[in-house]
């Protein structure tokens, strides 16, 4: 079936989104054109502005329109002395939703992966080391993902922290709240046993 070149172009563009295949892209394109053209225009405008105006914070590397993001420029956060290292800006959002962290962040935009040619410079560790040297940092909390690459990245950063006399800690991994032990995989259960805590009354 021969379709409009513009329609084909729209469907192809939509396929750049994660989890969107040919059928999903087709449904989205038809939905926008048939029922929600105003929504499509808003989407196009928002995408154009975001792609041209959103960059990276010069301190933590998260997404922002400013040179320094709102979290990094917050005086209370600066006085806190803690930096939480995460793999992506989405991780910041997840941690902020807990309301349990009052420090600043550093976003790696990935993790170390020598097999893929991703080394320390590719994930901004030079900038992190600069911050360790010049800022008054009391603790670096390593919140990389509990994967082989995430653990290797955390270990590398912990060594960097040790070289600069800064305490490094790793977020706990283990059995999820409300989970049943028989449903938990062996690796997670091993982490839970190794990282057990004394009972507090």
UniProtKB/Swiss-Prot annotation:
It comes from the Bacteria. The keyword Transcription regulation does not apply. InterPro entries: DNA_Rcmb_RecR, Rcmb_RecR, Rcmb_RecR_Znf, TOPRIM_dom, TOPRIM_RecR. A zinc finger (C4-type) spans 57-72. Residues 81-176 form the Toprim domain. Keywords: DNA damage, DNA recombination, DNA repair, Metal-binding, Zinc, Zinc-finger. SUPFAM superfamilies: Recombination protein RecR (SSF111304). CDD domains: TOPRIM_recR (cd01025). The keyword Zinc applies. One of its GO terms (biological process) is DNA repair. GO terms for molecular function: DNA binding; zinc ion binding. NCBIfam families: recR. Belongs to the RecR family. May play a role in DNA repair. It seems to be involved in an RecBC-independent recombinational process of DNA repair. It may act with RecF and RecO. This is Recombination protein RecR. The gene is recR.
């Amino acid at each position: 079936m021969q379709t409009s070149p513009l329609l084909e172009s729209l469907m192809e563009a939509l396929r750049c989104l994660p989890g969107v295949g040919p059928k999903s892209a087709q449904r989205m394109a038809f939905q926008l054109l048939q029922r929600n053209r105003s929504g499509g225009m808003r989407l196009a405008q928002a995408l154009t502005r975001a792609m041209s105006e959103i960059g990276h914070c010069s301190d933590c590397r998260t997404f922002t329109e400013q040179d320094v993001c709102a979290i990094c420029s917050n005086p209370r956060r600066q006085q806190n002395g803690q930096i939480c290292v995460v793999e992506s800006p989405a991780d910041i959002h997840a941690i902020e939703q807990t309301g349990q962290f009052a420090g600043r962040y550093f976003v790696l935009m990935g993790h170390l992966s020598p097999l893929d040619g991703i080394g320390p410079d590719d994930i901004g560790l030079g900038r992190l080391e600069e911050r360790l040297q010049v800022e008054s940092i009391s603790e670096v909390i390593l919140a990389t993902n509990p994967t082989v690459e995430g653990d290797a990245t955390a270990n590398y950063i912990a060594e960097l922290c040790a070289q600069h006399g800064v305490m490094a800690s790793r977020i706990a991994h283990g059995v999820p709240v409300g989970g049943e032990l028989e449903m938990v995989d062996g690796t997670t259960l091993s982490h839970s046993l190794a990282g057990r805590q004394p009972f507090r009354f």
